[in-house]
Amino acid sequence: MSQLTITDLTKSFNDDNVVDSVSFSVEKGEIVCLLGPSGCGKTTLLRLLAGLEQFDSGKIIFEDSDLSKTPASKRNFGLMFQNLSLFPHMNVFENIAFGLKMKNFSNQHIDTEVSNLLTMVGLKGYSKRDVNELSGGQQQRIALARAIAPSPTLLMLDEPLGSLDSNLRNSLQIQIRDIVKKIGVTSIYVTHDRNEALSIADKIVLMNNGKIIQIGTPNEVFQSPANIFAAEFLGHQNIISGQLKSNSNNISFDCEFGKVILSNKITYDLADNSIIIDTRGISLFTKNEADNIESTDNLYECTIIGKSFKERAYEFKIQVNSQILIASFQPNYWGETPVLDIGQKAYAKINSEFIYGF
């Protein structure tokens, strides 16, 4: 049974629906990421759930209680924002203990909880530190500890890693997920970073222009984007328009650079008449190598027009007729990759099991 259910939630500013008939549910202990570009309504939606803004219509049901008239102070939700809002005049201990003191816990209980939380976030021994002297990553971990200290029934995080550099973001993503899963608190996590959402979420709610575009697990959303917006936002590069064809022998897709044979292991529902070719599903060969390939299905002559190294993989930009495609390769153990230069003629073979439709 869902712990949180949002039904037809709508909020407008100056007749503009920034949250437009949004509905989804969250299971107990689940991490749900609200993902989308800036201005898509995800932060406003979070503020509606927190009680910091009033919605125009719809329902928010949490543990069978309608929150329509429940003020933010009575919701027992933990909040963590990008700008941290740590109290600069309080040290680390006092910041984390703040919510516990508001709930009138004993000093002994507060001491124990703060100590446990500092250990959990990897900052044991930092209790007397000035928060202004901590690094950005350390401040984020203190903010997380403060948010979960009062044992909230729902944890809400709004772009908590947005101000950090990419390396620190990557390490803290893992740590935040581990901590949240360890304590078992249901969480709503807002981000515009697709990689962050794919790493942290149990479920992704993809938004654009105030509406939900798609809901699913990270794998479902990434492998089967609902439309071209979803595909592009999730980082897919080879998005091809065309027409699905089928006969007794195979299923194919006719597009700008030719006929592509599709896998008979995959069901293709091409509402947008488009396919995605995963960059990892394109192999490149010299002419001599291509001459030794048994099947010529999905084999195309191409020209290498670009080459770069990105995130432990080589990317080749190739031109097949007038279509530009990206092929990526992980170097093998010895660092070897296809020996192909810009301007060189080559052959591209597409693995049909790396083609997705939408």
Regions found by a protein language model. Name each.
Residues 35-37:
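The feature captures the beta-strand-to-loop junction immediately N-terminal to the Walker
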Residues 247-358:
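Non-catalytic connector elements of ABC transporters
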